[in-house]
Amino acid sequence: MIIKRSRKELRKIRHLRIRKKIIGTSERPRLAVYKSLRYIYAQIIDDTKGHTLVSASSLEKEIRSQLKSTKNIEAAKLVGEVIAKRALEKGIKKVVFDRGGFLYHGKVKALADSARAAGLEF
């Protein structure tokens, strides 16, 4: 019997396949992106220590107050700018981008482009 896998399950499989290849170090941590139906999240992670160095999401009050909606491309752009600003304050300039199994399109692309424009290199 063939069972069709859900989109969520297929995304998780893609993410595991990507994570085998992408590793964040202290010199070049990993910028991980996750999006739910309502919010978008970004974290900068040092995988060697297992620590989250910087995070930002459209769930935060300071970001949410500037937005009309937390689930559109504008929210992703703002989260990208905020994560880049916080990373630069901590001295992080270069990162490895982890799209989390999501297609590099729409909100994920908007977050990446705005983080690049704000000064992160990847």
Swiss-Prot record:
Signal peptide range in chain numbering: none
Keywords: Ribonucleoprotein, Ribosomal protein, RNA-binding, rRNA-binding
Cited SUPFAM superfamilies: Translational machinery components (SSF53137)
GO cellular component: cytosolic large ribosomal subunit
Any single biological process term in GO: translation
Example GO molecular function: 5S rRNA binding
Pfam families reported in the protein's UniProt record: Ribosomal_L18p
InterPro entries reported in the protein's UniProt record: Ribosomal_uL18_bac-type, Ribosomal_uL18_bac/euk
Quaternary structure and partners: Part of the 50S ribosomal subunit; part of the 5S rRNA/L5/L18/L25 subcomplex. Contacts the 5S and 23S rRNAs.
Family the UniProt entry places it in: Belongs to the universal ribosomal protein uL18 family.
Task performed by this protein: This is one of the proteins that bind and probably mediate the attachment of the 5S RNA into the large ribosomal subunit, where it forms part of the central protuberance.
Designated name of the protein: Large ribosomal subunit protein uL18
Source lineage: Bacteria, Pseudomonadati, Dictyoglomota, Dictyoglomia, Dictyoglomales
